[in-house]
Amino acid sequence: MSFRGKRMKNVANQRYYLVREDVLTDAMQKTLEAKHLLSSGSVSSIWDAVKQVDLSRSAFYKYRDAVFPFHSIVQERILTVFLQLQDRKGTLAKLLETVTITHCNVLTIHQTIPIQGRANVTLSLDVTSMTCDLDDLIQQLKRLDFVESAEVISSGAL
């Protein structure tokens, strides 16, 4: 399956880890710095952010959806998930039912118009009362037969 013109890795069994900053690669650390510059409003574009921290744009795009500062996850407890769904009747309702069962509070929903039998959905969730861990939630979403991909795109403040 391709996504944005690139071959996607099989993400069905991805897990999330908490690691110390000193074990992150230089590119990962600079990606976090660039994301901070963007979220704080210090810079107005990705190009400006990566230039300021001396990082290539390709490295930024490689890591931007994979590394998150721990404090933002703990403080905000807001999770944004991107899903690609098959266009079938009732998919959004079933997706929201799955999210509700885990006691996540849906803050925003954005769904694109289905094109070629697929639609993209972005959910912003308050996970303060979530009854499972993040890995379990993502796995539950991926197990839905109409979900082609599900990935965390942000957690807390970027």
Swiss-Prot record:
CDD domains according to UniProt: ACT_PheB-BS (cd04888)
Coiled coil (UniProt feature): none
UniProt superkingdom: Bacteria
Xref: InterPro entries: ACT-like_dom_sf (IPR045865), ACT_dom (IPR002912), UPF0735_ACT_dom-cont (IPR008310)
Domain ACT: 80-155
Family: Belongs to the UPF0735 family.
Name of protein: UPF0735 ACT domain-containing protein Bsph_3944
